[in-house]
Amino acid sequence: MFFLKLHAKQFLLSTALIPSLALTTTVKVHAASNTEDAFDNAANTFFWDIMDSSPINLHYSFSFPEDYKPSDNPPLGSFSETFTETAEILNRAKENLSAVEYNSLTAKQKQVYKLMKHYIDINLEYCTLPDYTSTLGPMSGILSTLNTTITEYYLLSEQDIINYLDVLKDIPRFLNDVVKEIEHQESIGYVPSLYAFEQALENKDAMTTLENHPYLEAFESNVSETGLSDDVVNNYTKQVETVLNNEVLPAFSSFYETLESKKASASQSKGLAFYDHGQEYYELLVRDNTGTDMTPLELKDYLTDKLTQGLMNLSQSYSHNPNLLNDLDSLTAPKTDADAILQTLNQKAAECMPDIGDTTYTLSYLPEALQVPNNLAYYLSSPLDNESRNIIRINPSEVGDDSMVLWTTMAHEGYPGHLYQHQYFMQNSFEYNIETLIGSLGTSEGWAYYVEKLSLEWAGLDEATADAYFTNMILGMAALSVVDIGVNYEGWGIEETSNFLTTYYGELDKNTCQNFIDTCANDPGVYLPYSVGYYKTEDLFEQMADGYSSDKNMYAAYLKMGSMPFTLLEKYLIPDNSI
């Protein structure tokens, strides 16, 4: 299992690893002498087991891992051993936790204990179900993750370059594993759709041609941080070109030929509901992605209620201002440059959010081959020993030239979104390395969307316009999330999807409905952390408000909990709840 901790802002179809004050440990912990030590041992063993499972984890967790020797496992990990190895790691972690006397732990240890238990229990359940991983999913599939892993591979030393070459050389084996994974899924009846193959094949030319290859371009950009001489850099650049030409490009060519062959017999997208134990898998996916204990049908009702209320609010706004729709379309942000926007947002956040001091980041636009559909941007958090490495990448094909979209996206990924959220937690609450790997996506994305709404007033919008702008956006996300539940849990096709969407948006053509189905069926549950996360965050703050003297204090209490799932957050933060 390899972890690349991305926080990405997703976009609708047309109609976001970690710094540290001090490392918890850089060596494996030996036998514990008391309860608190037993817990420390359990937490750190779990973390290092994950590091061992795929050496690239070590690179993304530490900039300078001199005190730890990578395992002999392939750099990119192995699909063929993933479930077996994952189950072994999880069962070992569960056994270690069971030896801990919970009532004797510190308050912080109890929090991390519950976070670990939540993560372990859910992921052990995955191991009991068929493998319905969305291998070719355009947004969450392994190809987009692989490309990001390679292009974001930072280079701070000559040893990093040597390790990078090893990673490149591992790509042919890894792609072969991906094919084996697809064939395994085919053997259990879970066949990638025509849409999934088409999306995967779109980058064929870019990934099989050396000129302007994203891996080479990324290397040439990243290598500058090593401080090596031009001669040394040129020599390594030639080595990278050789490995790409002789090993990586042929491997991608063969991989894409296999996809082309399989595409010929592919069919239209259909949700998890059509597969054996698919509904059980989706129930688990919902709990995992949202951080709640709601069933899919409970979640559907919850989101439908939010949709109904939101549309009523919009209708009232339109009745007061018949030109509101045109006003929203013509909005412009006070800044139009991404870096200038981030600086402005940082200043605004400092006025009403808990202080995080000075922070740094690197901001850039993605090359065409890495521009994933429906994904506006992402934030890659910093290594445990290098808090200054905060990376934000923007997808220009999705952001376009809309300055308000860019403004809210920078609020989502930067200040006071993921970058700020991450930095505050690391400065004020972080103690265990494992915390950085097992948080809830629903919680982190919920915060990022919540502060998007706050940022609209910082852009100079009046309250009514800001509410209408944000409501219009989040309702689209909620509607797509309901479609996701319908497609993957209830087996919706075009007719059911059309009937639902028509209720809220008027009649839509067949192709538009099919686009929604394609998105939801090929990346199941991918939108749920955003819509559910936002609404649950809003609900949580409403319930917390009376217990805090100011919004700033309330935000501080929330942020100190990190990315703990809502099922736990509600017990810690809502008055009269106990844990």
Set out the residue ranges of the language-model regions.
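Bacterial N-terminal signal peptides
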Residues: 14-24
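Sec-dependent signal peptide cleavage junction
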Residues: 22-34
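Universal eukaryotic N-terminal targeting presequences
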Residues: 1-2, 24
